[in-house]
Swiss-Prot record:
Name recorded for this polypeptide: Uroporphyrinogen decarboxylase
Subunit field text: Homodimer.
Gene: hemE
GO molecular function, one term: uroporphyrinogen decarboxylase activity
HAMAP family per the UniProt record, alphabetical: URO_D (MF_00218)
Cell compartments where the protein resides: Cytoplasm
CDD domains per record: URO-D (cd00717)
Length: 354
């Protein structure tokens, strides 16, 4: 069932689709999170996993930065490993550590234990989306999921990793096992995003947080086909699709291949290490760009923030002149917990003025 809203005034959807927005659209990754006192108050009473599987908490946390900052898009509050939990993986999110997998996936026999995502386990997510689309007015709602490679890294390493050595060793040395795992995780990602799209999200973003650890050749050989299958499977919903990774300057062209060419608006996220103008030259024609203020800038005081925000907006305009179909202002990664919420509010207001 398609319950998609019509949001002709959304600057986010306009920029993503290559239309001229009435103002530069802005939202920030991890805008719903530890930078907000209201979020910290809720989380003091609930674990991360509890929050991610409670419809009312998902709704409230997703709405908090919209109320406070006036951003142009809300991103569904969740965690990258939620679909793994919904597929039966025994895991927890440990404070100050991150996701921890009870039984890491290391062998072909382990891969065979990865089950399809069970829709009923993420019913609270769908319920929350219904509540959010009723509450958000003209503000777009972005659904999200982790890309298969990043999910695979968590499963193989057993948690966050600096070098992803076990992941890359399986990828390079046990390619049949690797491809079986990636195929299973691609199915999980597709199904989790289908749940969100069927419930009414206005756009989706796929996070490949750890893809920057790969060479371009390895990304193309072992990751790109699986990521492309995610976007191809979901293109029929007709919503803008964004592909984002960290440290992916050399991969931007390949990542744009995964997300574009499917007949729907395609957006490529850019981190702060690459200018938007350079990114415009690297991605496929027909892609919009999203980014790319360094999150640390928001800790450096308003004069620094103001200069940097103006610079990103100007770089975005140059990128559009250079061929990008649009620009969505964002950070190059997530809001840091120590960020002053008032600075974020002021930065959003400044973007809207420029």
């Amino acid at each position: 069932m398609n319950t998609r809203r019509e949001l002709p005034e959304s600057p986010y959807l306009a920029a993503a689709a290559g239309r001229k927005p009435h103002r530069v659209p802005v939202w920030m990754m991890r805008q719903a999170g530890r930078s907000l006192p209201e979020y910290r108050e809720l989380r003091a009473k609930n674990t991360m996993m509890q929050a991610c599987f409670d419809a009312d908490l998902i709704t409230e946390i997703t709405l908090q930065p919209v109320r406070r900052h006036g951003v142009d898009a809300a991103i569904l509050f969740s965690d990258i490993v939620v679909p793994l939990r919904a597929a039966g993986i025994d895991l927890d999110i440990v404070p100050d550590v991150g996701p921890v997998i009870a039984h890491p996936i290391r062998t072909a026999a382990d891969v065979a234990t990865v089950s399809p995502l069970r829709r009923e386990t993420v019913a609270p997510v769908a319920t929350a989306i219904g509540q959010l689309t009723a509450a958000l007015g003209d503000v777009a709602l972005i659904g999200f999921a982790g890309a298969p490679f990043t999910l695979a890294s968590y499963l193989i390493e057993g948690g966050p990793s600096r070098n992803h050595e076990r992941t890359k060793a399986m990828m390079l040395g046990e390619t049949e096992t690797w491809n079986a795992l990636m195929a299973a995780l691609t199915d999980v990602t597709i199904e989790f995003l289908r749940v969100q799209l069927d419930a009414g999200v206005d756009a989706i973003q796929v996070f490949d947080s750890w893809a920057g650890t790969l060479s371009l050749a390895d990304y193309r050989a072992y990751v790109l086909p699986h990521s492309a299958r995610v976007f191809e499977a979901l293109a029929g919903y007709g919503v803008p699709m964004t592909h984002f990774g960290v440290g992916t300057a050399e991969l931007l062209g390949a990542m744009s291949e995964a997300v574009s060419g499917h007949g729907v608006p395609a957006v490529v996220g850019v981190d702060w290490r690459t200018s938007l103008t350079d990114a415009a030259a690297r991605v496929r024609p027909g892609c919009a760009l999203q980014g790319n203020l360094d999150p640390v800038v928001l800790l450096a005081g308003w004069p620094v923030v103001e200069r940097a925000v103006r610079a990103v907006v100007e770089d975005g305009r140059r990128a559009v002149d250079a061929g990008a179909t649009g620009h969505v202002f964002n950070l190059g990664h997530g809001v840091l917990p120590a960020t002053d919420p008032a600075i974020i509010t002021d930065a959003v207001a400044l973007v809207h003025q420029l």
